[in-house]
Amino acid sequence: VKTTQRWTARWATLALAAAAVSAQAGTLVINTDASDPAPKAAWDAMVKGFMAANPDVTVKVNTFDHEGFKTSIRNFLTADPPDIVTWYAGNRMAPFVNANLFDDVSDVWKKEGLGDKLKSAAASMTIKGKQWGVPYTYYQWGIYYRKDIFEKNNIAVPTTWKELVAACATLKKAGVTPFAIGTKALWPTGGWFDYLNMRVNGYEFHMDLTAGKVPYTDKRVQAVFDRWDELTKPGYFLANHAGIDWQDAVPAFVKGEAAMYLMGNFAVDPMKKAGLTEDQLGFMQFPKINDVPMAEDAPTDTIHIPARAKNKADARRFLAYAASAKVQTEVNAILGQLPVNKDATKPSDTYLKDGFAMLSGAYALGQFYDRDAPAEMAKAGMEGFQRYMVKPESRKEVLERLESVRKRVYK
């Protein structure tokens, strides 16, 4: 009996070892924070499609809630890495790249021709000349405007800063607040700073600033606030914006009390539900200010291979699959967002169609101030932007405070 038990134990050990090897070779472990209904459905569809196309691979998905994922990602990348992990582009990706926790996937980009297909997101996926993941979905930011109010006041869609400021003056004179905004939650101010900085100083400067490489007291940052002054000082934003959230500013826009709204495309749904039609609601690109390439804010969700992943070969197959035009078309139809692959089928929705055209031709993509800057800097920055918008004369004091925070945060 003892001999039988010994053999049984030995065979069990061998079987477990064999299972571990086969799990490593044919199992792909994915950690994601796609816990909301639409992202979860999109990931379910993507995984199902991948397994159908690659029957030799079994995919295991671990889904975390957003906050839990953010706090545990560094731990599992170090201690028990999956084969695929979801994250974000730009400066949010940089700490993991710099800590050697993400794998260089430039080979996938080269093999699949992604430098061309994913061109708009290439800069935000590149560090030290190498690519560190694949983007699969994003959405546009821009200015939503009331076509009917523009028409009534003989305003053409502005494409330059001078034209935008002139349109604001015309609207104000007609008793219409030029811009709806609600800054109670602070982050909407980040969109304004992003666009003004990217249009005044360009994408590279904006990335350097949010990475802590430039003082907030720099004259180039002062130049951003010179432009912002042209909107804050004449009262071109809703007067009570610090006391309301972004959703609470939608009614003023719908009633025609305000004519424009700088916001992400997620705002279209509440605008339509409140009664605006496509004849009334238009979308435009944030106008040109200085002669710099036009970058856009487009928060981008990305897929990465941990540096210590066990099954990198199948992980690379998954990245190539997720980058394809067909898959990005299908996944984004579920998400109600935009495919990054420029060869994907154009969306039928008017505003997504406008966004797809704009982002496909973008020079580069910002991820939004609170993604591009570290949490402590982003919080202080957006508090400062709100204070400045309420009280433009506080500008000097605000920028000096932000500079002291920058020195502390980026030690």
Per-segment meaning from a language model:
Residues 93-101, 121-157, 184-209, 297-306, ...:
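Periplasmic solute-binding protein
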Residues 45-117, 124-126, 148-159, 259-260, ...:
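Extracytoplasmic "Venus flytrap"/periplasmic binding protein-like
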Residues 52-53, 58, 151, 360-411:
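Conserved C-terminal helix/tail region of periplasmic/extracytoplasmic solute-binding proteins
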Residues 88-141, 165, 192-194, 220, ...:
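Hinge/lid segment of periplasmic solute-binding proteins
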Residues 82-83, 113-149, 177-180, 293-294, ...:
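A structural signal for short loop-to-beta-strand junctions that line the ligand-binding cleft
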Residues 117-123, 284, 332-380, 387, ...:
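Long, aromatic- and glycine/proline-rich binding clefts that accommodate carbohydrate-like moieties
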Residues 170, 210-241:
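Glycine-centered hinge/linker elements that transmit conformational signals in sensory
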Residues 48, 52-53, 153, 226, ...:
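Extracytoplasmic/periplasmic substrate-recognition and gating elements
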